[in-house]
Design a protein with these regions (language model features):
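Conserved small/polar residues in nucleotide/adenosyl-binding loops
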Residues: 2-4, 212-217
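Short, charged/polar micro-motifs that form catalytic or ligand-binding hotspots
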Residues: 36, 40, 61-68
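Predominant activation on well-ordered alpha-helical scaffold segments within soluble catalytic domains
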Residues: 47-55, 72-79, 176
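Short secondary-structure subsegments characteristic of cysteine-rich extracellular domains
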Residues: 63-83
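C-terminal, active-site-flanking charged/polar segments
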Residues: 74-80, 180-190, 214
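Catalytic alpha/beta core of large soluble enzyme barrels
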Residues: 100-105, 111-209
Length: 217
């Protein structure tokens, strides 16, 4: 039932994908039906708001000693359900740590409309991406990556973690230390750093931004 919309689709709709080798080498006019099963393709079960869910259910962040075991249990339940569906339908399902971008706002407004304002849960105009540590929590880059690595293991359909650092142009060894930690400890992560350039004076560094103007050192 989950693949009913894709059944009967012919390879001609995207020749590069289905006929020329990007995904398969089907004949013209051939349907993609046989590629929907037997592990060739995957249906992703995306999720977001693990932090908010944990606050609502336990009163604690999922980074707390009380919250983390519960959050991991919920993640394992999602994986168990995907395995159950796969066994029943011969279709691959996988849990996906969704990078929701603007959808975090849409989901937050929908939750507010349905449940009202709940402190720590629906009192912001966004929900936290996937398993991510909430942006307001004080946590260093290494601790964050190590914590989130446990949830990436339970997001086999895809996941990405982020760490924010200041301008590191003059501290490349520190950047390499973070990158090595990522390589050794987590499946996939991104390092975001600030590096600005002023086209008027040529300043290359970090520029302070306000609503009305830019401030250079």
């Amino acid at each position: 039932q989950m693949c009913i919309r894709d059944r009967g689709t012919i390879s001609d709709v995207a020749p590069i994908l289905w006929q020329n080798g990007a995904l398969a080498r089907l004949k013209k006019g051939e349907t993609i039906d046989r590629l929907l099963f037997n592990g060739y393709s995957t249906i992703s079960l995306g999720y977001a708001g693990l932090y908010e869910m944990c606050v609502r259910m336990t009163g604690k962040s999922h980074t707390s000693p009380e919250g983390k075991p519960f959050a991991l249990q919920v993640m394992q339940k999602l994986n168990d359900k995907c395995a159950e569906w796969k066994a029943a339908e011969n279709i691959s399902y996988s849990v996906y740590g969704t990078p929701m971008e603007s959808t975090t706002y849409k989901f937050a407004k929908s939750l507010q409309k349905r449940f009202g304002i709940i402190p720590g849960v629906t009192d912001k105009n966004y929900i936290t991406n996937s398993y991510h540590v909430h942006v307001a929590e004080e946590i260093d880059a290494f601790e964050k990556l190590k914590f989130e690595s446990d949830f990436q293991k339970l997001s086999p359909g895809g996941a990405i973690s982020y760490v924010e650092v200041p301008n590191m142009q003059n501290n490349i060894p520190a950047v390499l230390t973070v990158m090595k930690f990522i390589y050794d400890n987590i499946m996939y992560a991104e390092l975001n750093t600030k590096s600005d350039y002023c086209e008027c004076c040529g300043y290359d560094g970090e520029i302070t931004v306000s609503y009305t103007h830019l401030t250079l050192p």
